[in-house]
Structure formats: structure tokens, C-alpha cells
Curated annotation (Swiss-Prot):
The keyword Metal-binding applies. Its cofactor is Mg(2+); Mn(2+). Residues 148-357 form the ATP-grasp domain. It comes from the Bacteria. Mg(2+) 2 binds at residues 324, 326. This is D-alanine--D-alanine ligase. GO terms for cellular component: cytosol. Its EC number is 6.3.2.4. Transmembrane segments: none annotated.
């Protein structure tokens, strides 16, 4: 049987570059075991932090070591940009020849330029199937403002929020105090200030005072031109995984327990800082409500293949509030998404196989 050549695309121009490598290593391992090994051939492609694509030995080395390439290694890697300085000024990257050999793409790129619709647009232009959401679903799942507006239209309950632009924060020192007044009046304290288009809690701050609010807005504006401020809520953080295309399934519900003030980047990716409770110790009726809302959110943003949907469970009032949808969640062996499916009866290798089959199904014109 002819093997399907899977283009495993990882790294990227993002603050989540290292997380992408971890996810890609886990997926490569899953593609190399048992039945998957007889069906799939892995063609790894590594996108450097400057945006250049590498194929051949370089990405294989990154997968083996789990570490980004050093600058000295990048300059001599196979598939790198031509050494002609005039060409370098014209194009930031050139496509390695191995791109033409790919039967299906498996992008494992987290954050901007990876799960925001940009790479999905490129893969769509290639007219080759790829795992995950398309341009629309990816873009909607990345931009927190567009996402929240969509959830609102879908009738999904969520925390109060206010959308802000960088111009409002930086343009006029006379306008900024009024903006802070409006935020305080609408949301109160504590509140969370977030860049609209970054993942893994990068640039997010919890604020409890005017001074902290001003500093957090200034910091978030350095990451993104679109910002969102959310009202704080005393709640448990629970998550549900979704798998499928037009008839998706929801996993069991899991809960995140952590020892920090909120689930920030350090807590997410530092060992033993957070515990995953699967299934979450919540009432069955609440779990079913979360699963239903996860499927509604998946459909609302036009997601495909996979997504992890995050919620707040306000135990005191029995309310469930949707927080966000992540259309390309972390995919290490210990990440919440594969763990939720493992507890739902789908092993990691089987999950990877099903995602590839879902991508082929979605691409098929029938």
C-alpha cells in the first residue's frame, strides 16, 4: 500500500515556537507507531523564527532534540534561503522543493502566523488537504474580539468585556484617562487585559487597580493593535475537546487546577504547576451543558477537525460562561486536548489518524 505523505509543519514566527516543537514531536511519534506507520510517511518542515522554511535534515534534527536550531545551524541547513543578498531582500522565504511531495499537511503552528488563518490560506492556495480549520474558522478562533462577537450572536453566555484598539491607548494622553474610566465603570475590578490575537496567555495581565490597568493596557498594546478587557469572575476553569467536521463529537469535560493567580504562560508550560482533572468533578447536567455549548461554539466559528473550548463554571450560581475556542490547541502527550480524548476512549495515535482522515473527508468534493 502506498503511504500517504504527511507534511508536518511546525515552529513558526510566534512566541509559541517551542510549544509547537513539543506538539510536533508528539504527533511525529504517534505517526510512527503501529498501524499509522504503515499508512503514513512523515515529511517534516520547520519554520524558523524569522519565517524561513527548512526541509530535509534540519527539521528532523529539531524533532529529535526538541530544541530550536541555533543561528549557526540555520545558516547551513538544507532547504534554507539562497545566499544571494539581493534575493533575500526580495523574499523572506523560499519554498523547499519537498513541498511538492506532500499529500496532506498537518500544521502544528500555535499563535500568530500559524492558527490565525494565514498559513491556512497558503495551504488552501496549494490545493492540498490540511488538518484543522480553514481560513475563516482559524481567524475567528484567534481574534478574541471577533470570537466574542460571534459567541454573542450565537447566544452563548460569556463574561462582560470591552474591545479596545492600540490607538485608544497610545494616541492621546487626554483620551486615555477617559478610556480607563469607561473600563472601570463597565467591568470593575478585578479585570483581565488581553491582546486579541496571541495565545498561551502571552501578554495577559490580571489587574486590581487603576495603576495596574494603565500598565497592563500599555503592555498589551505592545503585542497587538486590538485588545480586550474582561471582567474577572470567581469560577472554575473547565475545558471540552471537539473532534469532527459537520457532525462533531464532544469529549468528556476536564478541569484545570493551578497554584498561580491565573492560568498564565509559565503555569501552562512549567511542569507540576497545573493539574488536569479528567473527568472534571462537576454535576452531570453541567457537563452536558458544557458539551452542548462546545459544539455550538465549534459551529459558530466554522471550525473543522479539532478544537478545544474553554469555559468558566461559576459554582455559586451554577452558571456556565464560555471563555474561548482554540482551533489548534497544544498537542503534546500531556496537553489537555489529547488527554480529554484519551479519557473518552480515543488513544493519541488513533486521534492523529482520525484528524488526518477528517481533513481528507473535508477536502473531498463528494
Amino acid at each position: 500500500m502506498t503511504k500517504l505523505r504527511v507534511g508536518l509543519l511546525f515552529g513558526g514566527r510566534s512566541g509559541e515556537h517551542e510549544v509547537s516543537i513539543k506538539s510536533a514531536r508528539a504527533i511525529a511519534k504517534a505517526l510512527s507507531v503501529d498501524e499509522n506507520a504503515s499508512k503514513y510517511e512523515i515529511l517534516p518542515f520547520y519554520i524558523q523564527k524569522d519565517g524561513r522554511w527548512l526541509a530535509g535534515e534540519a527539521p528532523q534534527k529539531v524533532l529529535e532534540t526538541g530544541s530550536p536550531l541555533l543561528e549557526a545551524e540555520q545558516s547551513t541547513s538544507e532547504g534554507n534561503l539562497t545566499s544571494n543578498p539581493q534575493v533575500q531582500t526580495l523574499s523572506k522565504w523560499e519554498s523547499p522543493s519537498q513541498v511538492a511531495q506532500v499529500d496532506i499537511w498537518f500544521p502544528v503552528l500555535h499563535g500568530p502566523n500559524g492558527e490565525d488563518g494565514t498559513i491556512q490560506g497558503l495551504l488552501t492556495l496549494m490545493q492540498v488537504p490540511f488538518v484543522g480549520s480553514g481560513v475563516l474558522g482559524s481567524a475567528m478562533g484567534m481574534d478574541k474580539i471577533a470570537m466574542k462577537m460571534t459567541f454573542e450572536q450565537a447566544g452563548l453566555a460569556q463574561v462582560k468585556y470591552k474591545a479596545i484598539t492600540r490607538a485608544q491607548v497610545w494616541s492621546n494622553p487626554c483620551v486615555f484617562p477617559k478610556l480607563c474610566d469607561e473600563i472601570e465603570a463597565a467591568l470593575g475590578y478585578p479585570a483581565f487585559v488581553k491582546p486579541a490575537n496571541l495565545g498561551s496567555s502571552v501578554g495577559i495581565a490580571k489587574v486590581r487597580s487603576r495603576q495596574e490597568l494603565e500598565a497592563a493596557l500599555d503592555n498589551a498594546a505592545s503585542y497587538d493593535r486590538r485588545l480586550v478587557v474582561e471582567a474577572g469572575v470567581v469560577a472554575r476553569e473547565v475545558e471540552c475537546a471537539v473532534l469532527g467536521n459537520d457532525q462533531p463529537q464532544a469529549s468528556v469535560v476536564g478541569e484545570i487546577s493551578y497554584d498561580s493567580d491565573f492560568y498564565d504562560y509559565e503555569t501552562k508550560y512549567t511542569e507540576d504547576r497545573a493539574d488536569l482533572l479528567i473527568p472534571a468533578p462537576i454535576p452531570d447536567a453541567i457537563a452536558r451543558q458544557i458539551q452542548d455549548m462546545a459544539l455550538q461554539a465549534f459551529a459558530a466559528v466554522d471550525a473543522a477537525g479539532l478544537a478545544r473550548v474553554d469555559f468558566f463554571y461559576v459554582e455559586a450560581t451554577q452558571e456556565v460562561l464560555i471563555n474561548e475556542i482554540n482551533t489548534l490547541p497544544g498537542f503534546t502527550a500531556t496537553s489537555m486536548y489529547p488527554q480529554l480524548w484519551a479519557h473518552s476512549g480515543v488513544s493519541f495515535p488513533e486521534l492523529v489518524d482520525r484528524l488526518i482522515q477528517l481533513a481528507l473527508e473535508r477536502y473531498s468534493p463528494s
